[in-house]
């Protein structure tokens, strides 16, 4: 048994999973989950640079995660960066600064690597899995869609459709004007066009991961406090997403915060919900099963496979 920490550094949020890896029973046993809204990707879509203030937020977050890892006796810390680090021209400078300040080495994942790890993470430990299914991860900077079965990932794509990226690009305020909202709808449709056809075969069983999906599930279910046990495997219906979108597009940030959305997500959840709505509408998806798993679990599985001395047939 080995205990390790896995950190997913996204455009908006950094997430920590501390888990026990059991190579004998091929299992991942979660010990601790944490997340911090860092907004590393603030203005990266326009400037292609991660600024000093965002970097300092990330460093402080990683120092906190490192302390938690130490408290829980994790033997190793594995950290991966996604869309914001992929896009930033000063990526290596940021990574070097982080190493010097925290001792944590960040690997920047390609979109394809992110999609594959998210797919394997989302299905980790799944019982009675459908024959074929699709996984969607709507992040702050990009959206990853992947399809396959429990044995193999068949198809994946990473698109620059993210809640932070498109909010900065297309909304001047919250609530957005009617013109901005419908322009965003058309832009998302344009970006999805030509990329969704391969996933029609897996549209009957779709799993959604990451903060946008879990926040939407929390809002739809009416939970006052986020309870991972109640969110995991929550069935999210298209009509519920459509109704929530109608509500969110007319609310101020303060009103959205009043609904229980964290301050660092309240300004981008309308766009995140719009992205999900258009994905479901264009692909003809009637229901999505929300999972609290994802990239961190995929990273943990990869570490577990290395412990076993095996190579995954997916990664």
Language model region names:
Residues 2-29:
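N-terminal basic/disordered segments at the start of proteins
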Residues 4, 18, 43-74, 82-132, ...:
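Helical "lid/coupling" subdomains associated with nucleotide-phosphate turnover
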Residues 6-8, 79, 135-137:
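Class I SAM-dependent methyltransferase core
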Residues 11, 140, 211-214:
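Short, glycine/acidic-enriched loop or turn micro-motifs at the edges of active sites
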Residues 15-17, 39, 78-79:
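Short, conserved beta-strand segments within well-ordered enzyme catalytic domains
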Residues 25-44, 69-70:
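Conserved ATP-binding subdomain of kinase catalytic cores across diverse folds
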Residues 141-147:
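Acidic, divalent-metal-coordinating active-site segment for phosphoryl/phosphodiester hydrolysis
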